Curated annotation (Swiss-Prot):
Keyword Transmembrane helix appears in the UniProt entry: no
Residue numbers bearing the O-(pantetheine 4'-phosphoryl)serine modification: S39
Name the UniProt record assigns to this protein: Acyl carrier protein homolog
Highest rank taxon of the organism: Bacteria
Keywords, comma-separated and alphabetical: Fatty acid biosynthesis, Fatty acid metabolism, Lipid biosynthesis, Lipid metabolism, Phosphopantetheine, Phosphoprotein
Organismal lineage: Bacteria, Bacillati, Mycoplasmatota, Mycoplasmoidales, Mycoplasmoidaceae
Post-translational modification (record): 4'-phosphopantetheine is transferred from CoA to a specific serine of the apo-ACP-like protein.
Pathways involved: Lipid metabolism; fatty acid biosynthesis
Amino acid sequence: MQERDILLKIKEIAKAKNFKTELDESVLQKPFRELKIDSLDMFSVIVSLEKEFDIMFEDEKLMQLNNLAELIAEVKHLISQKGV
């Protein structure tokens, strides 16, 4: 799966959950806190991504995710590990 496809899915989730910030390529490196995305918002995105892609984030790894680019990279990694 390509990063762009993952970003599109995250954008769909954010829109469905009425996020105030538009999540697109222009904000990939901005910290979540600058985007006004709090822990509850992140939790809902993570749960939706786990269901959508049949993946499971490790709690320790979640604590290290600081921006959208890192989240996309981790989703891509977890998807690639499913076939192993």
